């Protein structure tokens, strides 16, 4: 969901920088621009780094139940979630004019073959992957209705708009605009059903993956970078109580980048 983003007024800002040399140099360069405060005391956070460090920061905030607006400056490679980096203290002016885009993580509740249950959050995607040479067989249920009785292949994933340009896109899934309020359900190297290429679901959907014959065909579940092995079932839905807000410059051509990414080669 997109929210109005002009007229921001932040008096307490946190500065977070990735450990790369370039990001550390940028942090030193803007260190005197304002009196930075710890993340827990801030009204908003400025993040220096790439998309990977931005995701780490977002997970840190989700785990701590912090809901500060986040303004990223790209000092990495792609910088899909970041704004263009420029030197100097103008970042404070840009913050005041930034527009807001709200993003919510997926909540994964996974049940292992032993019956243990664990929960994790995923900003990008949750993927189920075969653990051995045996083809994974997975039942897919959407809103308590079985949609695919048996998906045979390497696995399946459910991606948020934030994650739709990552693993999902590599698996031939669709790229979703950040404010689309949709989810991408994408098979990974499917064998059967041969013609099913995935689905785009409203982000209020509840999705369940049930592993068929899990002893013979073990499957792992990965929520971003957290992995659980020997899965029996995974239940997924958007967790709106952990919503985060990303800040983008008004001239940040995010929609153009989403379109361009689909024609990259």
Placement of each model-derived feature along the sequence:
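A residue-level signal for conserved active-site and pocket-lining positions in enzyme catalytic cores
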Residues: 46, 74, 126, 225
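Catalytic core of DAGKc-family lipid kinases
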Residues: 18, 23-24, 76-155
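ATP/nucleoside-binding phosphotransfer catalytic cores, i.e., glycine-rich phosphate-binding loops
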Residues: 120, 128-129, 133, 143-148, ...
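Short glycine-rich anion-binding loops that position phosphate/pyrophosphate groups of nucleotides
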Residues: 50-53, 76-78, 162-165
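Gly/Ser/Thr-rich active-site loops/lids in small-molecule metabolic enzymes
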Residues: 150-153, 157-194
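Proline-centered loop/turn at the N-terminus of a beta-strand
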Residues: 67-71
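ATP/NTP phosphate-donor binding region
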Residues: 1-48, 54-63, 85-101, 111-120
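Short, conserved loop/helix-junction motifs that constitute active-site signature segments
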Residues: 63-66, 176-177, 199-201
């Amino acid at each position: 969901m997109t929210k109005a983003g002009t007229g921001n007024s932040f008096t307490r800002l946190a500065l977070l920088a990735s450990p790369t040399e370039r990001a550390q140099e940028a942090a030193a360069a803007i260190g005197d621009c304002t009196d930075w405060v710890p993340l827990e005391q801030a009204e908003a956070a400025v993040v220096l780094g790439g998309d990977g460090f931005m995701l780490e920061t977002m997970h840190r905030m989700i785990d701590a139940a912090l809901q500060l607006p986040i303004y990223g400056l790209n000092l990495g490679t792609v910088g899909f979630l970041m704004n263009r980096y420029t030197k100097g203290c103008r970042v404070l002016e840009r913050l005041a004019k930034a527009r807001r885009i709200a993003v919510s993580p997926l909540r994964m509740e996974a049940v292992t073959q032993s019956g243990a249950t664990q929960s994790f959050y995923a900003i990008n995607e949750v993927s189920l992957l075969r653990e051995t040479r045996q083809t994974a067989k997975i039942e897919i249920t959407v809103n308590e209705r079985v949609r695919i009785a048996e998906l045979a292949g390497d696995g399946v994933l459910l991606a948020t708009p934030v994650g739709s340009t990552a693993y999902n896109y590599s698996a031939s899934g669709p790229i979703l605009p950040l404010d689309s309020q949709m989810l991408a359900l994408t098979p990974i190297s499917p064998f059967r059903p041969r013609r099913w290429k995935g689905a785009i679901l409203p982000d209020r959907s509840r999705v369940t993956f049930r592993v068929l014959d899990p002893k013979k065909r073990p499957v792992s579940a990965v929520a971003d970078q957290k992995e659980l092995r020997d899965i029996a079932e995974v239940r997924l839905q958007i967790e709106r109580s952990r919503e985060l807000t990303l800040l983008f410059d008004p001239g940040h051509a995010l929609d153009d980048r989403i379109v361009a990414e689909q024609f990259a080669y």
